[in-house]
């Protein structure tokens, strides 16, 4: 599966247990998204366009209106990324 660098970075952050908070308008469409890292910092790579691509590819999902998280079946497909800590 071909993923852009921003999509990969967003998936790696989500794989560490983080979430994508979303805001919907009156018609139910997602108008803005914010992806938070483990430390609670805002991830700038996660834009509305990246969010829509990940959702279209069914890599992320939301259950009962909760924040979007990585799909459990896709969690195993994400390659490990070195964490420089």
UniProtKB/Swiss-Prot annotation:
MF annotations from Gene Ontology: DNA topoisomerase binding
Source species, domain of life: Bacteria
Xref: InterPro entries: YjhX_toxin (IPR018654)
Family label: Belongs to the UPF0386 family.
Name assigned to this protein: UPF0386 protein YjhX
Species of origin: Escherichia coli (strain K12)
Gene name of the record: yjhX
């Amino acid at each position: 599966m071909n993923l852009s660098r921003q999509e990969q970075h967003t998936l790696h952050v989500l794989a560490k247990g983080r979430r994508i908070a979303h805001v919907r308008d009156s018609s139910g469409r997602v108008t803005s998204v914010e992806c938070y890292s483990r430390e609670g910092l805002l991830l700038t790579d996660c834009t509305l366009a990246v969010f829509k691509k990940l959702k279209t590819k069914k890599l992320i999902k939301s259950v009962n209106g909760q924040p979007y998280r990585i799909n459990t079946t896709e969690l195993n497909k994400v390659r490990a990324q070195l964490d420089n800590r």
